[in-house]
Amino acid sequence: MAKSPNNSAAQRVRKKVRKNVADGIAHVHASFNNTIITITDRQGNALSWASSGGQGFKGSRKSTPFAAQVASEVAGRAAIEQGIKNLDVEIKGPGPGRESSVRALGALGIRINSIADVTPVPHNGCRPQKRRRI
């Protein structure tokens, strides 16, 4: 006897939970290869996130300020749907998308309270990678 088709894929779809959070934190991780933006509430629970690679940019185009701007707009719009009005921005990393991602969040109408650089700096910890010779 043949098995009946299982609707497990249709059952797993969950409705998006709408939170009503006014204040949050935007974590911008700007590496040399990609930029990842995560918007959380004050406790650190993620409300929305986006990355340059997730927006269709591949290869070296992921590491451009424009790709970071597009990713910030996507994450910011999703956060506005959750009720975000004020953000503190924490930027980590030396990448090219640092400034453009903050500008994109401000252009969406989100009020930016503070901008902090939380790039980890070693107190002479691990040995760095060897210098690149071109």
Curated annotation (Swiss-Prot):
InterPro entries: Ribosomal_uS11 (IPR001971), Ribosomal_uS11_bac-type (IPR019981), Ribosomal_uS11_CS (IPR018102), Ribosomal_uS11_sf (IPR036967). The gene is rpsK. Pfam families: Ribosomal_S11. This is Small ribosomal subunit protein uS11. GO terms for molecular function: rRNA binding; structural constituent of ribosome. Part of the 30S ribosomal subunit. Interacts with proteins S7 and S18. Binds to IF-3. It comes from Polaromonas naphthalenivorans (strain CJ2). HAMAP family: Ribosomal_uS11. It comes from the Bacteria.
